């Protein structure tokens, strides 16, 4: 039906007859001429109708926005004065000789000239996707997946599919369950990741595996989370952690070069402990130069228990955050930031405004100055490298609260005060995570997942001191987003059972939930390691949006609902009966007597 795409016509086509298919993006009737901007997935081209072609001209008078049409016409070069530098096709236009209205359109429920609510955009997603910026994001996504496949194929990786209907295993989030009609009372789980299957593939001898795969997690959503998401899943045998990181870093560097023409350079690395100490985050945004600076040793003896208490507590921390130019902040702005960090458990936000650095304590303004002497103030100013016009915020609490609160404040200040350099890319590797973390109930939980190997520990050493274990794990972070995470896996049955035991999984539960894995580990398992990238996050970064729903064709809301199809919905009672399922309403869901 077409010979060219609208957005691909240029001066080389001048004089040629073309057939185009697409939509009316805009129509202008000048009386003697009718102009339309015609749009398809590749872009927009100007088409004009002349009364000399009476049939086409008369039909063109009926055109309205979003009519689906086909035109036949001749490509002409525009006069110099009529060229449009804002359009990729602005040097040419089409003189239409034939017009077919394929389908008419009712007035759109979306306004192309204004910002529509996200609810309206998701309800009419098929119309929202007609917008060039949305179409371009999905085209970029397709380009990314094509690039990844070529790269992985060139590196000798095999694209192998793993099951969608599998067994529920504890991986940190709730599973989406699928009832079995054949096996009454039993359920499949949709995979949170292909983790165990890709490890089993290593045991099968497929030493380089990858897959671009859907994963499912029934968890509370955020701007960068969806209940179903896509991973670039990778696993290797007989490769060390540095070797895995080298290949995956090369993939990302070449991807950025291909899509953005940007050289990311070699990725720096830092340990989890360093990242938390300096940035209050295990995924630090290095575009922001501000850092947390420990000052507890300077404040142990002050008569201000808010400082001295945490400073003398082995689990406490007192840290300072210097804000360049922050002395210009008003009291209300500071109070707003204090309220902001309450979300992270902080109870207050002490500060020092540096008016004249050379004057020491005489050159500052601070509500806590009365608790500090000149020597302490000078040490704080020196350690934080404060200058005239700066502001220093303090966090004093448990180490976790200080890291969480000041880490979040650092990011917010970076955005609010334009301290974060939005024109650069800042990738890094974060290494050496703790293997376990406190679950809040006198137990431990795996920081990554229970199949991650510890660094340089025997099963007996791990069992005796699990809280000291460092995981052989690594995360790739770009501009404050964790875009990929991986680890060396456990390939020893005794070590795997030891980890399960530390996590409180009984031997009976181990057999019930992971018997197939424990059996497989008995048969010559190779050392293996891998990584998974969040494809949606990669596309989000590469297309310059901060909302993951912008890079998924048909996403869910933050309530995990599809406004377009109205999923989820109630199941047919007959289907539930066939599955042996009865829906039991909770008391709060039942209608009251007054309803």
UniProtKB/Swiss-Prot annotation:
Residues 195-198 are annotated as: Aspartate. It is found in: Cytoplasm. GO terms for molecular function: aspartate-tRNA ligase activity; ATP binding; nucleic acid binding. ATP binds at residues 217-219, 226, 482, 534-537. Keywords: Aminoacyl-tRNA synthetase, ATP-binding, Cytoplasm, Ligase, Nucleotide-binding, Protein biosynthesis. CDD domains: AspRS_core, EcAspRS_like_N. Its main location: cytoplasm. Disulfide bonds: none annotated. Its EC number is 6.1.1.12. NCBIfam families: aspS_bact, PRK00476.1. Catalyzes the attachment of L-aspartate to tRNA(Asp) in a two-step reaction: L-aspartate is first activated by ATP to form Asp-AMP and then transferred to the acceptor end of tRNA(Asp). Belongs to the class-II aminoacyl-tRNA synthetase family. Type 1 subfamily. This is Aspartate--tRNA ligase. It comes from Erwinia tasmaniensis (strain DSM 17950 / CFBP 7177 / CIP 109463 / NCPPB 4357 / Et1/99). The gene is aspS.
């Amino acid at each position: 039906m077409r010979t060219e795409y609208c957005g691909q016509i240029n001066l080389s086509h001048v004089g040629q007859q073309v057939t185009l298919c697409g939509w009316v993006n805009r129509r202008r009737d000048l009386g003697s001429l009718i102009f339309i901007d015609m749009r398809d997935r590749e872009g927009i081209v100007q088409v004009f109708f002349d009364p000399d072609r009476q049939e086409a001209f008369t039909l063109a008078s009926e055109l309205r926005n979003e009519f689906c049409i086909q035109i036949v016409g001749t490509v002409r070069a525009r006069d110099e004065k009529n060229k449009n530098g804002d359009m990729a096709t602005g040097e040419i236009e089409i003189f239409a000789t034939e017009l077919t209205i394929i389908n008419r359109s009712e007035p759109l429920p979306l306004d192309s000239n204004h910002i529509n609510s996200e609810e309206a955009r998701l309800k009419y997603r098929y119309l929202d996707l007609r917008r060039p910026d949305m179409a371009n994001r999905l085209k970029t996504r397709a380009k990314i997946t094509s690039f990844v496949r070529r790269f992985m194929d060139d590196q000798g990786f095999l694209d192998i599919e793993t099951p969608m209907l599998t067994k529920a295993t504890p991986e940190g989030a709730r599973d989406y369950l699928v009832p079995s009609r054949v096996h009454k009372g039993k359920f499949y789980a949709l995979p949170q990741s292909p983790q165990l299957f890709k490890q089993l593939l290593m045991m099968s001898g497929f030493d380089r595996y990858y897959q671009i795969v859907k994963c499912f997690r029934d968890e509370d959503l955020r701007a960068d989370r969806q209940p179903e998401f896509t991973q670039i899943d990778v696993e290797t045998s007989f490769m060390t952690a540095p070797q895995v990181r080298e290949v995956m870093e090369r993939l990302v560097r070449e991807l950025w070069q291909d899509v953005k023409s940007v050289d990311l350079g070699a990725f720096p690395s830092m340990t989890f402990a360093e990242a938390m100490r300096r940035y209050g985050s295990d995924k630090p945004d290095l575009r922001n130069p501000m850092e947390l600076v420990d000052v507890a040793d300077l404040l142990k003896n002050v008569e201000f228990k808010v400082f001295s208490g945490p400073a003398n507590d082995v689990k406490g921390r007192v840290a300072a955050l210097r804000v360049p130019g922050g002395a210009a902040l008003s009291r209300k702005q500071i109070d707003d930031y204090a309220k902001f960090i309450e979300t992270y458990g902080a109870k207050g936000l002490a500060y020092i405004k540096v008016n004249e650095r050379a004057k020491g304590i005489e050159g500052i303004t601070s509500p806590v100055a009365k608790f500090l002497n000149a020597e302490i103030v000078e040490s704080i100013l020196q350690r934080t490298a404060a200058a005239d016009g700066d502001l220093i915020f303090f966090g004093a609490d448990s180490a976790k609260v200080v890291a969480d609160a000041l880490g979040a404040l650092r990011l917010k200040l970076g955005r609010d005060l334009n301290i974060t350099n939005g024109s650069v890319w800042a990738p890094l590797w974060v290494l050496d995570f703790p293997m376990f973390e406190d679950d809040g109930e006198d137990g431990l939980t795996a920081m990554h997942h229970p199949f991650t190997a510890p660094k340089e520990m025997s099963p007996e050493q791990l069992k005796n001191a699990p809280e000291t274990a460092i995981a052989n794990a690594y995360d790739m972070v770009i501009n404050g987003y964790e875009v990929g995470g991986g680890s060396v896996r456990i390939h020893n049955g005794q070590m795997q059972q030891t980890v399960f035991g530390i996590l409180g999984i009984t031997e009976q539960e181990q057999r019930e939930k992971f018997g197939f894995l424990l059996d497989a580990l008995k048969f010559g398992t190779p050392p293996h390691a891998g990584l998974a990238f969040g494809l949606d996050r990669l596309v989000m970064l590469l297309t310059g949006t901060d909302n993951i729903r912008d890079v998924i064709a048909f996403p869910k809301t933050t309530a995990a609902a599809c406004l377009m199809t109205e999923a989820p919905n109630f199941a047919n009672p007959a289907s539930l009966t066939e599955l042996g399922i009865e829906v039991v309403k909770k008391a709060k869901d039942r209608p009251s007597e007054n309803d």
